[in-house]
Amino acid sequence: MEIKEISTAALKEKIEADEELYLIDVREDEEVAEGMIPQAVHIRMGDIPEKMETLDKDKEYVFICRSGMRSMNVCKYLDEQGFKTVNVEGGMMAWEGETKPKN
């Protein structure tokens, strides 16, 4: 199954256009402490299996990590469970928009 991907530029456009977006950052606590996209929700990759029951299979979720590898693995896993997923190409390393420290 081919996983959909979005560039950081296209993601930034969606955020700036105030489009409805379900963005999940799957990095570790110490990584998001350095800054995350303000519109993102933080769910560590290791917590995804137990948290997936809180996700809605009718919604499309966009996943981001540091480089795009972990988020791709999360996308593949959730895709197999019947979720609609999109991976952010290049992850936070490619992101040039605003970030904020996680509270």
From Swiss-Prot:
EC identifiers of the protein: 2.8.1.-
SMART domains per record: RHOD
Top-rank lineage group of the source organism: Bacteria
Pfam families (UniProt xref): Rhodanese (PF00581)
Catalytic site: 65 (cysteine persulfide intermediate)
All copies of domain Rhodanese, residue ranges: 17-100
InterPro entries: GlpE_sulfurtransferase, Rhodanese-like_dom, Rhodanese-like_dom_sf
UniProt entry keywords in alphabetical sequence: Transferase
UniProt GO MF annotations: transferase activity
Protein name as annotated: Putative sulfurtransferase YtwF
Phylogenetic placement of the source organism: Bacteria, Bacillati, Bacillota, Bacilli, Bacillales
